[in-house]
Amino acid sequence: HAIRSAIKSKDFQSVIVTTDDKKIATIAKSYGAKVPFLRPKTLSRDSTGMDEVILHTIKKLLSMNYEFDILVNRDCTAPFVRNADVRGSIQLLKRTRCHAVVAAYKTHLNPYFNMMEFNKKKFLEFSKKMKHSIVSRQTAPPVFQLTSFQAIDVTQFLKNKKMYTSKVLPYEIKA
């Protein structure tokens, strides 16, 4: 679904799938995606961070003479992100000159109000503390549940080697 949707949108120069699996590569190609290389197994473990995968992908594509300023990461766990939200995320990235935009939605779970964790003495305390008490969810700072869809400024990513810098914005979507 994600491949078809991305191709149908006509918003991208290339729709590329990065994988280490030849079967997945064959399936991706059959839907119209490009798979110009297979990802190394070392970047396909459960313990591998997305920053490492994205850095490898950007460097590999640049070495293959692909030219792009923005990389849109639409992970297989986010197949139903709407094309309008993809376009909105890209526009927000360009307009604000932030480092990345992540599709996200406001969540009712809030570490300032109704989420707790164990302290050193094994008693519960709020996950995030504020200088003043939060008396209701409505007065707590808004927090976002991130999705696995991001629009990333390539130059900034290469400079910082990570997606989540201090200049990341949410593109709010419906949960």
For the regions a protein language model found, what residue spans apply to each?
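N-terminal glycine-rich phosphate-binding loop and ensuing alpha1 helix
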Residues: 1-18
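Buried hydrophobic packing segments
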Residues: 6, 54-57, 157
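Residue-level signal for alpha-helix termini/capping positions
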Residues: 7, 62-63, 94
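Short, high-confidence coil segments that cap the C-terminus of an alpha-helix
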Residues: 12, 66-68, 95-98
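Conserved beta-strand segments of alpha/beta enzyme cores
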Residues: 14, 34-35, 167-169
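Structural beta-sheet core signal
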Residues: 17, 73, 100-102
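Short phosphate-binding loop-to-helix
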Residues: 22-72, 80-81, 88
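Conserved core of the sugar-phosphate nucleotidyltransferase
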Residues: 52, 79-167, 172
